[in-house]
Regions:
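Polysaccharide-binding surfaces and accessory modules of carbohydrate-active proteins
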Residues: 5-21, 27-29, 33-38, 43, ...
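Active-site-proximal substrate-binding groove within the catalytic cores of carbohydrate-active enzymes
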Residues: 40-41, 238-240, 453-686, 696-708
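Aromatic- and carboxylate-enriched substrate-binding clefts and catalytic-loop regions
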Residues: 314-551
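Non-catalytic beta-sheet/beta-sandwich ligand-binding modules that flank or precede catalytic cores
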Residues: 719-803
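Extracellular glycan-recognition modules
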Residues: 805-865, 893, 933-944
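Flexible glycan-contacting loops in extracellular carbohydrate-active proteins
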Residues: 806, 903-929
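Short, aromatic/His-centered strand-loop micro-motif at the edge of beta-sheets
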Residues: 862-883
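Localized edge beta-strand/strand-to-loop motifs within extracellular or lumenal beta-rich domains
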Residues: 880-894
């Protein structure tokens, strides 16, 4: 086993000392008449050792409101139960059956470890030695327990480990508990769907760090069960002993389930793979299986253009989905549509200052070719066919080693930073000759080995990227139990209980005339309710992959039978509703031609807003009732005294809803003096009230309305004018760094009040006057308006109207001044010139303090704007004539085009759109040709012309 967060250690590897007296500290060990107490400032455990036998003592939780809460396991409780098989014989060995040999402790990083060693005990004629290790750290509100088991090496073949129960606590009558319910199948069986969940006992949570452990309350006993089915000769060992997966016991602030869940999720975040906000494009709903190397490149270019020209930071990845594999071959390989494999797509993503991602379906995809592909793989000796599910047996070691080799190879060759691993074991495979485990209750021998091997593969994938100083996002999709403990290896997991997309009409207040995106939201959010409230799966929504947003040409409307359509407002509601769910992972399933200017503006604004508020949104909780019944529902997310609450009315009639600002929806008890701004529908100023913990908020929602409220300290910083430019012969564009309002606004152009239009992003104002501007003359701007926080905004600016955005066009000669005034400010621009030189270490063009274009000592072309620099991928000082286009985009990215083709890009998040001072533009050593400076960033298709 390879652990991502906590690595159990053998007792032989640490310096353990006898526990002979009380040991104080941030983590303490105290001897009592009953035994030994292990504790810290959050909680403590008593291990009863009376009579030389171990029994489960009380647990004291100091985190609860008021007095500390004590949990007392029932008399039948056991710290562990081991079950063995030898031939047809079975035996069980409980902690209480063993005689304690010694108590010892060791100092470990940040805490202490307690070891309880037992005298060897005969099991089915073989001596078995067990040690219990409990590890507690000073800063943790949870401890871990695991056991160390050994048998004589020469007899290891004779004894099989069936299963282990850890923290087997008998639940006494009247104790408040929660355990996962019996649930319906979601492609995989209901039993397997429920694996890897915690149990709640009073104000405690209990679980196992193996994501396929069977943890639940059964017959009045809470326990976490690990299945094996392997003989001790085949179990993985460390220093000759078998180490179990750790069980976890944690303390929460309350026995209320919502609070328990929040505190459990806090623990999960400590063991999870680092996961931040992520945005990327995926080809699936644009082309589905009809992707080619050419149309992928075309879509990448168009999506990047739409996002970049609206100020969105570079995507975290551009992803090729299914359609690249040749399903007629004996293993994963490229079909004839990808003659250069993925090199063109991967290279283009890099040229966007982005990364590349890829889909692979371990089971063989989801097409009519899947069963045949499994047969081809078996015939080629690269794996086997699972007869139960008629797909690839994903547990066969030969196949696992083959795909691991492919993963590592593809990451090396194509620099992949994202994998969409789509489809694992739909049904447990019964064929032992495939080289994997079979049998056990609910086929759990198969399931345990399956996920132990796959998590080892994920570890190897991450290790390769980490050694290269690079990141990796693993998206774990279909036929996976959504256990939060998988997050030790993966970043996101598909919700399992949903289709990729669908359309649903509420049973109350719904109509066949409901919009496409309304029906899509109702469907997906109903699946969220099924996930959270029906199945009661304890999984943080920030890590839940939900296949949204979808706005692609392959999705057909049930109303029109044509490609789905959304109005500007419907599209805005759709994206904000997705943001409110708290997902960290935005995979844009878009077709670029379906997004008009307003939709691009909205997409850019929502992505910026969601990322800026992700520290809040990542804590989202569902509130209300499922939209399937037409009821108001939403999401509530809080980080300290900052909160975002969304509500949606899925019905076609008006409805009322009241929110109570308490900890059940995530509000901290000390929250006070909070202001409230309405994000959606956009309200230009706060409501002027002060809110505190426990307050109620009554709302009336119009039919199909999405309402989003943001709570927190009042924002006193007024919006700032970010970029001002002439947008036409009689209009200027004013872009602010926050939302603004044009209501009552006063914007003067050369002293005359302008007609104002607020753009769909709510950040940009178009101010137009009746008289045309004079070419190449300054336009004086005076603006007085309010921002979304109600702050008064007063700005003055001066812009020059350049017909066709051309600042100048001039013939270059060495040392010549091409223009007295070039570019200035934080905006985008383009510099274009021809180049034919053999010089090195030579400045070609420059505007002091703003930009330089130069040939470096190695012959590469370098374009520097402020403190950001982009270099060509190859030398340009070979004397050949070529055209150069260098530009800064609206999102601050620098790009270099050579002969009309994108060659390289650079982006620095710490130096976005640095303000550039005005100044003269000079040709230094540029030998000649016509130079153009343009007051906007040209798009790739304009440059190619």
């Amino acid at each position: 086993m390879i652990f991502m967060s906590f690595q159990p250690f053998t007792t032989a590897s640490q310096s353990f000392a006898p526990v002979q007296e009380t040991v104080e500290g941030g983590v303490y060990l105290r001897l009592s008449e009953q035994g030994v107490i292990l504790g810290n400032g959050y909680f403590s455990r008593t291990y009863q050792t009376m009579g030389g036998r171990l029994s489960a003592g009380g647990i004291l939780n100091r985190r609860v409101d008021g007095a500390a809460a004590e949990y007392l396991p029932g008399e039948a409780s056991q710290e562990f139960i081991l079950r063995f098989v030898s031939g047809r014989k079975r035996a069980a060995l409980s902690a209480g059956d063993l005689t304690i040999d010694s108590l010892s402790y060791a100092d470990v990083s940040g805490g202490k470890a307690l070891c309880i060693s037992f005298q060897p005990s005969a099991v089915l004629g073989l001596p078995v030695t067990v040690r219990l290790v409990a590890v507690l750290k000073e800063q943790d509100h949870f401890l871990r327990e695991y056991i160390e088991v050994s048998v004589p090496e020469q007899q290891a073949d004779s004894l099989t480990l069936d299963s282990i129960d850890l923290l087997s606590f008998h639940v006494q009558q009247g104790q408040k508990t929660w355990s996962r319910p019996e649930m319906e199948p979601a492609n995989i069986s209901g039993f397997h769907m429920g694996l890897g969940q915690p149990v709640y006992l009073g104000s405690l949570f209990l679980g196992c760090e193996f994501p396929a452990a069977d943890t639940r309350i059964e017959e009045h006993t809470a326990r976490t069960r690990y299945y094996s089915g392997k003989s001790f000769s085949h179990l993985k060992k460390t220093d000759g002993v078998f180490l179990s997966w750790p069980a976890v016991l944690g303390a929460a602030r309350s026995d209320d389930r919502e609070v328990l869940q929040s505190d459990f999720f806090c623990y999960i975040e400590t063991v999870s793979t680092k996961t931040e906000f992520r945005k990327q494009y995926n080809s699936w709903y644009d082309h589905m299986l009809d992707i080619t190397s050419e149309n992928i490149v075309g879509s990448f270019y168009e999506i990047e253009k739409g996002l970049t020209q609206h100020g969105v930071a570079p995507m975290d990845a551009y992803v090729v989905d299914d359609g690249w594999n040749d399903y007629s071959k004996g293993f994963w390989c490229f079909n004839e549509k990808f003659p250069q494999e993925l090199y063109p797509s991967a290279a283009l993503a890099k040229k966007f200052a982005s990364h590349f991602g890829l889909w692979l379906g371990p089971r063989g995809g989801y097409t009519m070719d899947t069963p045949r592909f499994a047969k081809h793989i078996q015939k080629a000796g690269n794996g086997f066919r699972n007869p139960k599910s008629k797909d690839i047996c994903v547990a066969a070691p030969v196949y696992q080693q083959g795909v691991k080799k492919l993963f590592l190879d593809f990451m090396q060759r194509f620099d992949l930073n994202y994998w969409k691993l789509d489809g694992f074991a739909l049904r447990p495979c019964p064929k032992k000759r495939h080289g994997h485990m079979t049998g056990g209750e609910h086929d759990m021998y198969f399931t345990t080995e399956l996920w132990e091997n796959w998590t080892d593969i994920f570890t190897e994938m991450r290790r390769q990227r980490e050694e290269q100083g690079k990141s990796l996002w693993i998206n774990f999709t279909c036929y996976v139990n959504p256990s939060p403990w998988f997050l030790q290896w993966v970043n996101s997991i598909w919700m399992q209980n949903s289709g990729d997309h669908s359309f649903q009409i509420p049973s109350k207040g719904g109509s066949k005339q409901d919009s496409d995106v309304d029906r899509m939201m109702t469907y997906r959010d109903d699946r969220y309710f099924d996930f959270v409230y029906t199945r009661e799966l304890q999984f943080p929504l920030a890590h839940l992959y939900n296949h949204d947003p979808i706005y692609g040409n392959t999705v057909k409307s049930p109303r029109t039978k044509q490609t789905i359509q959304a109005t500007t407002e419907e599209f805005r509601n759709y994206l904000y509703q997705l943001a409110a769910r708290g997902t960290s992972f935005w995979e844009l399933y878009f077709s670029f031609h379906m997004l008009d200017e307003e939709k691009w503006e909205i997409c850019a604004e929502v992505l910026r807003w969601a990322e800026a508020h992700f520290h809040i949104l990542r804590n989202a909780k569902l509130i209300g009732k499922t939209p399937a019944g037409g009821d108001v529902y939403g999401y509530s997310a809080w980080d300290g005294a900052e909160g975002i609450v969304s509500l949606r009315n899925p019905a076609n009639f008006q409805q009322e809803y009241e929110i109570t600002l308490n900890r059940l929806i995530g509000v901290k008890e000390d929250a006070a003096d909070m202001g409230c701004t309405q994000v959606l529908p956009y309200a230009a100023k706060p409501d002027g009230k002060a809110y505190r913990y426990g307050d109620g908020v009554k709302l009336t929602l119009a039919p199909h309305e999405v309402r989003i409220l943001r709570f927190g300290a009042p924002d006193r910083q007024a919006a700032r004018l970010h970029v001002a430019k002439a947008a036409a012969g009689n209009a200027v564009s004013l872009c602010f760094d926050k939302r603004v309002s044009t209501e009552g606004a006063r914007v003067l152009l050369n002293g005359v009040q302008a007609k104002l239009t607020l753009c769909a992003d709510y950040h940009t104002v178009i101010a137009a006057c009746q008289e045309a501007f004079k070419p190449y003359e300054a336009v004086q701007i005076e603006a007085a308006l309010t921002d979304c926080a109600g702050n008064a905004v007063k700005e003055t600016a001066q812009v020059v109207y350049y017909p066709d955005d051309l600042i100048f066009r001039a013939d270059a000669r060495p040392g010549a001044v091409l223009a007295e005034r070039g570019i200035e400010g934080e905006g985008d621009f383009t510099l274009a010139f021809p180049l034919s030189t053999e010089d090195a270490d030579a400045v070609l063009l420059a505007q002091d303090g703003a930009f330089t274009a130069a040939v470096d000592v190695d012959g590469t072309l370098r374009f520097t704007v402020g403190s950001v620099c982009v270099a060509s991928t190859k030398p340009v000082n070979d004397g050949k004539r070529r055209s150069v286009t260098a530009l800064r985009e609206k999102n601050g990215m620098l790009k270099l085009y050579l002969d009309g083709a994108l060659d390289a890009s650079a982006y620095c998040a710490e130096a976005i759109n640095e303000a550039l001072p005005a100044g003269e533009v000079r040709a230094e050593k540029l030998p000649g040709g016509t130079v153009r400076l343009i007051n906007r960033a040209l798009a790739f298709d304009e440059i190619a012309k």
